[in-house]
UniProtKB/Swiss-Prot annotation:
This is Putative competence-damage inducible protein. The lineage of its organism: Bacteria, Bacillati, Bacillota, Bacilli, Lactobacillales. It holds the Pfam family CinA. It comes from Pediococcus pentosaceus (strain ATCC 25745 / CCUG 21536 / LMG 10740 / 183-1w). It comes from the Bacteria. SMART domains: MoCF_biosynth.
């Protein structure tokens, strides 16, 4: 069957955001054997949306619209589709109750514009949104079927995975069950991991294997098709074993929505390993990330932001002579910062950060030159030097993420 994607949003046309949703859906449809015939991007304009629907309906079996389901006046995708197919919109009771409960919980008044998010086309099936308020739509006609989905990726992707896939399987009798497995790796570079698993990737058609790279970790997503869920799981587990035989030493977690930092903090909580930090260039960003994880208070009593040299000495005992002899961006200072923080708060481990975020150099140290230290209660200390590339924000972020990576490598792994 042929499908067409219509992305709705003036912000996409203006280049203010990247349309990752269309890419996500196209890749998924390809795995299902659904051919994406075309993609159209239109602004928040009723005539343009209806024109796109008319063109798409003439040449495609399935038309998917993405975006334009919010509460504002320019969110008009449902209204445009209703006018195009000649149907009325009415509030879906369950969706409207979800919106009502949400605003009541937030102690905010429910306005008419927010009720718009619960509108459903007469004769259509609702596609429920587990992560938002905008109700999706599936509408069947003799010539063309329509799926209407919200634009925020945090809502769109779960709806596609959890709601649209089963709906498509049921509606079109897709002959196979589709199951996915997501594996997460850290401590290995993009090129190295790709080279190690290249033979497996090249020789596999079921499951399909997709690699996604981020600055600090790598995700491998496996998607299998089979006649049953059990058979699909067997295929996935077989390929997972093949991959782990090659890169298992870098594997840290499995699951669709895994945050590396959450994983590390939760492992510390599980093992009752207390943590503190002494931060210079990162300015508290590491500690802020730690406390984003629920339950972090059980292992994180607090930390230190020691931006100035004198504060490093005053709060965590870094010797002025150490800074003078080695400069503040050095292994020796990272060691004393980590050791001082660990002893001061009597934690099991402590992480330290000292370096140059930029944009200028500091005492011959170039932007991106960072030392991270990790001190343990037993007196051992690990330090590592990094030379990150990027702007000030990126350098600070990479430093924070590699602090978590050092904990994983030296404490958890």
């Amino acid at each position: 069957m042929n499908a067409e994607i219509i992305s709705v949003g003036t912000e996409i046309l203006l280049g203010e955001i990247v349309d990752t949703n269309a890419v996500y859906l196209s890749q998924l449809f390809a795995k299902l054997g659904i051919d994406v015939f075309n993609k159209i991007t239109v602004g928040d304009n009723e005539k343009n949306i209806m024109d796109a629907l008319e063109v798409a309906s003439k040449r495609s079996d399935l038309v998917v619209t993405i975006g334009g389901l919010g509460p504002t006046e320019d969110d008009i995708t449902k209204q445009s589709l209703a006018k195009f197919v000649g149907k009325n919109l009415k509030h879906h009771p369950e969706a409207l109750q979800q919106i009502t409960d949400y605003f009541k919980k937030q102690n905010r008044p429910l306005t008419k514009n927010n009720e718009r998010q619960a509108l459903l086309l007469d004769g259509a099936k609702p596609i429920h949104n587990p992560n938002g308020l905008a109700l999706g739509i599936f509408y069947h006609t003799e010539q063309t079927d329509y799926i209407v989905l919200p634009g925020p990726p945090s809502e769109f992707e779960p709806m596609v995975d959890e709601k649209v896939l089963p709906l498509l399987s049921q509606q079109y009798g897709l002959e196979k069950t589709i199951q996915s497995k997501t594996l997460h790796f850290v401590g290995i570079g993009e090129a190295d991991l790709a080279a190690r698993v290249d033979e497996i990737v090249r020789n596999q058609s079921n499951p399909t294997i997709a690699l996604y790279f981020k600055p600090t970790d790598v995700t491998i997503r496996l998607t299998a098709k089979a006649n049953s869920k059990l058979a699909a799981e067997e295929i996935l587990n077989h390929t997972k074993k093949q991959l782990l035989d090659r890169v298992g030493e870098f594997f840290y977690a499995e699951g669709d929505r895994v945050s590396f930092t959450d994983f590390v903090v939760n492992q510390l909580i599980k093992r009752n390993i207390s943590l503190t930090a002494a931060e210079s260039l990162t300015g508290g960003a590491f500690e802020s990330t730690v406390v984003e994880t629920s339950g972090a208070a059980t292992i994180f009593p607090g930390g230190f932001v020691t931006y100035a040299d004198e504060v490093k000495s005053k709060l965590i005992g870094v010797q002025p002579a150490t800074i003078e002899e080695n400069t503040v961006v050095s292994r020796q200072v990272a060691e004393e910062m980590a050791r001082g923080a660990q002893k001061t708060l009597d934690t099991d481990i402590a992480v330290s950060f000292t370096g140059v975020a930029g944009p200028g150099a500091l005492e011959h140290h170039q932007p991106g030159n960072v030392w991270i230290g990790l001190a343990k209660r037993d007196g051992s200390i690990v330090t590592k030097e990094f030379n990150f590339v990027g702007n000030r924000e990126k350098i600070r972020h990479l430093a924070v993420m590699n602090g978590f990576r050092m904990i994983w490598e030296n404490v958890i792994k």
